[in-house]
């Protein structure tokens, strides 16, 4: 299958997952903090680490990397939403939540990429 179609297919799945996860997190925790965006970014970062490590070890095809790594995870994770939600918190004067959002997204996402890679490298 053409890689462009695989990216489009993965992207449509990732976008739907992001939407459903965000709605679920608002229902569970409310809308005072962007937990949905945090969760999709952390989960997507972990999965990106796994996909990257598997790709480095030639255990997945370029087509699967296009489907999952570029398409699904590219649509699942979202830097633009993270940035907008952080700015909104700042504009509302909630500097603590804005700072917490930045620190949590950056530190947890970096750690999850590392963890995903280490999990794969230690098992294979």
Swiss-Prot record:
Q: Which Pfam families match?
A: CRCB
Membrane-spanning segments: 4-24, 35-55, 60-80, 102-122
Q: How does it sit in the membrane?
A: Multi-pass membrane protein
Residue sites binding Na(+) per the record: 74, 77
Please provide the Gene Ontology terms (biological process) for this protein. Answer: cellular detoxification of fluoride
Keyword Cell membrane part of the UniProt annotation: yes
Instruction: List the Gene Ontology MF annotations in alphabetical order.
Output: fluoride channel activity; metal ion binding
Localisation: Cell inner membrane
Q: Which InterPro entries match?
A: FluC
Keyword set, alphabetical order = Cell inner membrane, Cell membrane, Ion channel, Ion transport, Membrane, Metal-binding, Sodium, Transmembrane, Transmembrane helix, Transport
Keyword ATP-binding attached: no
Q: Which reaction does it catalyse?
A: fluoride(in) = fluoride(out)
The UniProt entry's coiled-coil ranges are: none
Q: Which domain of life is it from?
A: Bacteria
Activity regulation behaviour: Na(+) is not transported, but it plays an essential structural role and its presence is essential for fluoride channel function.
| GO CC terms | plasma membrane
As for family, the record states: Belongs to the fluoride channel Fluc/FEX (TC 1.A.43) family.
What job does this protein perform?
Answer: Fluoride-specific ion channel. Important for reducing fluoride concentration in the cell, thus reducing its toxicity.
Protein name from the UniProt record: Fluoride-specific ion channel FluC
């Amino acid at each position: 299958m053409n890689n462009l179609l695989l990216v489009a297919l993965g992207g449509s799945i990732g976008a739907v997952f992001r939407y459903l996860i965000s709605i679920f997190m608002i229902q569970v925790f409310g809308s005072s903090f962007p937990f949905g965006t945090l969760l999709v970014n952390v989960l997507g970062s972990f999965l990106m680490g796994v996909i990257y490590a598997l790709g480095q070890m030639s255990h997945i095809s370029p087509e699967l990397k296009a489907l999952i790594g570029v398409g699904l995870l590219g649509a699942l994770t979202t830097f633009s939403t993270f940035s907008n939600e952080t700015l909104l918190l700042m504009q509302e004067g909630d500097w603590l939540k804005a700072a917490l959002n930045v620190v949590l997204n950056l530190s947890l996402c970096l750690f999850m990429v590392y963890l995903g890679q280490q999990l794969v490298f230690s098992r294979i």
